[in-house]
Regions:
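Active-site catalytic microenvironments in core metabolic enzymes, especially phosphate/sugar-handling
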Residues: 101-104, 231
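Charged catalytic cores and adjacent phosphate/nucleic-acid-binding surfaces used
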Residues: 1-34, 40-60, 65-96, 108-263
Length: 263
């Protein structure tokens, strides 16, 4: 995978190539959707499928209200959803952990579309842009920077918004965003869904250089989508990422501790 003329030949000659991330290093998948919004399976079905794949944990991160086409959750429904997720987690008796989360929309001005009171109840808050993709670079950059300043955001979802062969990445100063995310203790996502593969390998390498953790997720809307993790692993390997660079290569307890350690 290391064939982009980024120092791999010199490293190989010095026997200094790193042990790159592997599929077996991933302990959980923390971006997925259920029938509560636009997914096709229940919380329990997603958890059972993840357990079959050998994962230690998942996070259920259904959409928030601004994405109306997905039947996104408002504050009241989100609180009910948290309750149900915790019930399923208890039913599974530790065989796999199921963390309550949300994929919250970043509005045009950088505000989030759920209240902080609700976000505070979530273990995993992913903030994502799903609208107004044509904002100028300076405006989009400021929008995303404002969003990740929210103290409850833990992961920036599909950070450039690209859909391969369908939509170009929006204009954003991704280096500034990644640098600030690193300072804040916010991870940036590599969305392994084949339509996205976002961040790209160049930006993943930049994140590694800036000390920003990566969360690799499948954005699954069906139990079968979890197998798409392998596509993302290939991109992480192209970017020289190791197990130490990846947030969800941590154990369940370490993962939660990392999320809760945000300054």
């Amino acid at each position: 995978e290391l064939r982009e003329n980024n120092g791999e030949i010199d490293a190989a000659e010095k026997h200094a190539l790193p042990r790159l991330i592997e599929q077996r290093d991933i302990r959980g998948d923390v971006h997925m959707h259920t029938v509560a919004t636009d997914g096709r399976n229940s919380i329990r079905e997603m958890a059972d499928a993840a357990l079959e794949r050998g994962y230690e944990y998942i996070a259920i991160t259904d959409h928030s209200k601004n994405l109306a086409m997905t039947n996104g959750l408002d504050d009241a429904r989100a609180l009910e959803h948290i309750k149900r997720i915790r019930e399923v987690d208890a039913e599974l008796e530790g065989r796999i952990r199921v963390f309550p989360g949300i994929e919250v929309d970043i509005l045009g001005d950088g505000e989030l579309d759920l209240s902080n009171e609700v976000l505070a109840q979530m273990d995993v808050v992913i903030a994502s842009v799903h609208s107004l993709f044509n904002q100028p670079e300076a405006q989009m950059t400021e929008r995303v920077l404002r969003a990740i300043e929210n103290p409850y955001v833990r992961i920036l979802g599909h950070p450039t918004g690209r859909l391969l062969l369908r939509r170009e990445a929006f204009q954003i100063d991704i280096a500034s965003v990644i640098r600030r995310a690193s300072e804040l203790g916010v991870a940036v996502e590599h969305n392994a869904y084949p339509d996205r593969l976002d961040l790209c390998d160049r930006d993943l390498r930049l994140a590694k250089e800036l000390g920003c953790k990566i969360s690799i997720n499948t954005d699954s809307h069906h139990t079968s989508h979890m197998e798409k993790m392998r596509y993302g692993i290939r991109q992480l390997r192209r970017a020289w990422l190791t197990k130490a660079d990846v947030l969800n290569a941590l154990s369940a307890n370490e993962f939660l501790a990392a999320l809760r350690s945000r300054p």
